[in-house]
Amino acid sequence: MKTKIILSTLLMLTFWCNAQTTDSALKEVQKIIEASNKTFSDFTNKNDGSIVARYTDDACLFPPNGEPKCGAKQIDSFFRGGPQVHVIFTIQNLYGDPKTAVTEESFYEMTDMNGKKLDDGKVIVIWKKTKEGWKMHRDMFSDNHPAKQG
């Protein structure tokens, strides 16, 4: 009986320690993603295609009310020529395997360069760990406002 109790305790400690490690690793990944999110609009505002480096080679962007944009050329085309804006992302949930891929659920608020609110909404991004670091693999977003009627 004593052996069973000891084994059960060791087993519980093993699971608990593993959960702590994963939790800690996810927090580290979240810090990396938050840093990337803080500079997102800087890259889109450059209008020079540098935003594409934030995505995996086989990434897809899923904008609202439009076809998916897959690959560097289409993603660059989507962002190029867009308005100068500032976007703040607030991560609500982050889950997955901190060694390979995680999913980010965030809210965003978009303002013009003078701070006037233009839009707000939600984002789901699947981040993939690459040899160059964490990159966006799938990026889907939509605003929080009803569709405008014709």
Residue ranges of model-derived segments:
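Structured segments of extracytoplasmic/periplasmic soluble domains
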Residues: 39-47, 54, 58, 78-82, ...
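Surface-exposed, charged secondary-structure patches
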Residues: 76-115
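A short gly/proline-enriched turn/hairpin at secondary-structure junctions
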Residues: 58-69, 80-84
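Short, low-complexity N-terminal intrinsically disordered segments enriched in polar/charged residues
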Residues: 17-54, 147-150
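Bacterial Sec-dependent N-terminal signal peptides
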Residues: 1-24
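Hydrophobic pocket/interface hotspot
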Residues: 40, 51-52, 59, 71, ...
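Short beta-strand edge/turn micro-motifs at domain boundaries
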Residues: 122-147
